[in-house]
């Protein structure tokens, strides 16, 4: 049998990992949740083990080593952390997503593998690992959650008759082979208290047909196993019914590969088969849980009966000892006295406290009054200073306004004076120019008259005298013309001096 297992592993390893898609392994379904139940995923993400310890693991080989040392079952919840026997999914009488229980180490590491985005070669290394069946189980579970349903048969077909055993239940008690586990993966959605991704109906029918064509092979027993079964058959017959119950509750488990020195895949098959399947194991587990619940109910009834017996004993003791009532009365009177004295002390303490509180309140009131008085003084000072400042500003504004008005009046007066001076100067200039023009006109008239008289008187004078006379008249004209511009220039200078301030 060990030789056949090694041949299967060699065939699986020699299977071409490239294929059409190469070494890259496509993911099916939700690429963020790995198609996990929301309750399990929430508990995985909030687990301190996943957030702290697994966060430090960065490589595929580190995660495989962690699986080897930490995983001892492939159930989603730890033992005793979820009180919902026989129920799956989101049911179980609990409300909310995060109320499932303590998520198992196996599922934390399974989601860690999903975060690494495994290649086809790495997945083949998981499902053909020779050190631990738990590593192989997580590899097959990774395929069930992440690969397309039509490809599941191609992945599992070579391992449907694998006889390597592992205990899949938390706390032990459910030993099965790898082949039985894979057949359960293909034919059932339920896995303890969770569900696998649903398989489409046509694909499921094809898988069922394939499983019918691949019936389970009877286990091949070695000679050593037959001898062990014969040796254990005799004491088993003597133990009786109780021994059978004890053996059915805790079926034998193959030795762990971690305790073996050579870590070989050849495991000793110690459990009795007799046609037992995985369904039978589950049914037996449910019976065990039902019996445990019945035992708990019996324990509760026993506790109630014991409590009743204790009450009866107390009543009997009370009836037997009547003196206890007197003693109780005395103790009650003592307690009353003590309570009275304590109450008096408490009253005095309360009075003292009240007095202290009143004195403190009076002090606080006086402090508040002083503060308010001081604030009022400060406010009055501020108001006075503000009023004085406003009055000063008002006076300054008035003075500035008066000064401005005076300046304006002075300017207006100076402007009026300048206008008057200008008008007087212009009138003087006009009068002077008129008088001068009149004088010149009179002089010319006189000259003309003299000329006419001279012409009449001296008509008979000589030409020399006439020439001299003409020269003199011309000289006079020239002299008169020269005097006119000089007089006009003098008047202009005088007017300019008068206009200048």
From Swiss-Prot:
This is Pre-mRNA-splicing factor 38B. The gene is prpf38b. One of its GO terms (biological process) is RNA splicing. The keyword RNA-binding does not apply. The keyword Magnesium does not apply. The lineage of its organism: Eukaryota, Metazoa, Chordata, Craniata, Vertebrata. It comes from the Eukaryota. Residues 1-11 have a biased composition (Low complexity). It comes from Danio rerio. May be required for pre-mRNA splicing. Residues 281-328, 342-408, 437-447, 469-491 have a biased composition (Basic and acidic residues). It is found in: Nucleus. InterPro entries: PRP38. One of its GO terms (cellular component) is precatalytic spliceosome. Belongs to the PRP38 family. Residues 492-501 have a biased composition (Polar residues). Residues 243-273, 329-341, 409-435, 448-468 have a biased composition (Basic residues). Residues 1-28, 208-501 are annotated as: Disordered. Residues 281-302 form a coiled coil. Keywords: Coiled coil, mRNA processing, mRNA splicing, Nucleus, Spliceosome. Its main location: nucleus.
